[in-house]
Amino acid sequence: MEEIQRYLQLERSQQHDFLYPLIFQEYIYTFAHDRGFSRSILSENPGYDNKSSLLIVKRLITRMYQQNHFIISPNDSNQNPFWARNKNLYSQIISEGFAFIVEIPFSIRLISCLEGKKIVKSQNLRSIHSIFPFLEDNFSHLNFVLDILIPHSVHVEILVQTLRYWVKDASSLHLLRFFLNEYCNWNSLITPKKASSSFSKRNQRLFLFLYNSHVCEYESIFVFLRNQSSHLRSTSSGVLLERIYFYRKIERLVNVFVKVKDFQANLWFVKEPCMHYIRYQRKSILASKGTSLFMNKWKCYFVTFWQWHFSLWFHPSRIYINQLSNHSLEFLGYLSSVRINPSVVRSQILENAFLINNAIKKFDTLVPIIPLIASLAKAKFCNVLGHPVSKPGRADLSDSNIIDRFGCICRNLSHYHSGSSKKKSLYRIKYILRLSCARTLARKHKSTVRAFLKRLGSEFLEQFLMSEEDVLFLTFQKASSTLRGVYRSRIWYLDIISINDLANHKSKF
């Protein structure tokens, strides 16, 4: 227990003072809108709209200096001049200033790590693109997975308390608490489906930063406790990607020394099931080679961990235990599972013949066709049954522009789902988009689809129908013709377009 406390104290020792005066500096709000400065500290947000000016900031600072405007009661909160007419505008400016200021301590730590002044403790963090090869290399060797939905209904006070571990400037934290309590409907700010107000859309950077800091606090403690429970240190998040057969070698080592009595106590720790942890946004998975009982213990541990350490109700139904050979895992826009392929080998020794049945595990990724059709139906490309319809809103565009837009959507979907094991399910999506494009053009020219295609021919859709196989062939024209067969296998692209939207099936078609 003392070692855990020392670890937490070490992590929280890098605290920074005197952030409160920065709130009243005009240049802070200018920097918050300067994309060049934001890019230098790796915190660029392309969703910014530059609407602040020195005049607005001066008025804001003047009103913030008047402390009587911060005395708000439930009866006169709507009549307070500070939050009255320009409430959304002021909240946007304050939120951007807060987001910029509270990111300063984290940016300093990040820059110092990049310059080699400090050992990076978050060495297990990886880009989202590393998740796909990690799943492909490791999931075929695993048995069970915990599908976890991280709680998002976090109380504002818990978020402020989490931030206090890193920033001990009481004045700025009090002002932040006041700002959050005045505005915050936390469920609508974190959950994108409910974020319909202009305030929620404009101030997501601050609230997402607070929520991510809360999740980071949970993960840092969880990973530390996990590493203390085994002799295999820090094996999560794909650190050992280049050592795919590492655990097979360990099992081989166990078989070699199994007859040695002195190794019995140590071998129990070595043979402990390996745990892999991956998180993307609000969803995380914990996979292992262990048994169902072993995963149930981890499920109980997660529930207790969230409830006692973070004072947050965490219902057990938010954690699902799935066996990879029987269930599919929905993650990052794919349905992932482990398929068992039976293989029969005939062996003959002299006059005796034997049939040996081998079960080969293979990582399988499928395209979730039903959610994709639902997204297309929501965007009015088809109905709920998947029958294509025209897009009246695009009938005013030129023919080439209409084809380019439909083709871009089709190529993005094909590009993202190129890692699928079975690409035949994408043909239906291409059919919906192709026929929807044809019906939109026919409606524009007041003709039928058949007559329109017969008059113009099918060549005008060649760019629209270009598949990933053709893209590979055009990219590597000097390579052998056998390269076309590469398309039949799984391909993970590292330049995925609109990965966040496609991973959540919320693409803005």
Curated annotation (Swiss-Prot):
Coiled-coil region list: none
Transmembrane portions of the chain: none
Keywords: Chloroplast, mRNA processing, Plastid, RNA-binding, tRNA processing
Location of the protein in the cell: Plastid, Chloroplast
Predominant cellular place of this UniProt entry's protein: plastid
GO CC terms in record: chloroplast
GO biological process, one term: RNA splicing
Gene Ontology MF annotations: RNA binding
Family named by the database record: Belongs to the intron maturase 2 family. MatK subfamily.
The protein's role, per its UniProt record: Usually encoded in the trnK tRNA gene intron. Probably assists in splicing its own and other chloroplast group II introns.
Protein name: Maturase K
Organism whose genome encodes this protein: Ibicella lutea (Yellow unicorn-plant)
Organism ancestry: Eukaryota, Viridiplantae, Streptophyta, Embryophyta, Tracheophyta
